Amino acid sequence: MAVDLLLGLQWGDEGKGKIVDVLANSYDIIARFQGGPNAGHTLEFEGNKHVLHTIPSGIFHTKAINLIGNGVVIDPIIFTKEIQDLEPYNINFNKKLLISKKAHLILPTHRILDAASEACLLYTSPSPRDVLR
């Protein structure tokens, strides 16, 4: 079984999602192996623009099974919204989308803890002015 890999070796925004969308009909499996909901792949399907953050770009293609792998970070709130936004297209997610049991989750508590941690840094770190004195 041959495998082709599409990697972005810059800072993102290389158009990987669009390339996958163009090539998806040639593949049985489209896998997203890393990244999180901060990524965004803008695709056009049936004349409508869609921005996918977690769901792989091959989801609109009938042949491809889409896989969310171990290294992907899933925000359940964003993921649920993506699924709901795609409901009008009658995509059978039970057959077309597989999610690794080892994929990571971003929960609301993580966001709260992250915000609290950042807020503490604002008050405990010396300012550049203090360092230069």
Please name every model-derived segment.
Residues 1-125:
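Non-transmembrane, aqueous-exposed alpha-helical and coiled segments at domain scale
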Residues 123-133:
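Single conserved hydrophobic/aromatic residue that forms the stacking wall/gate
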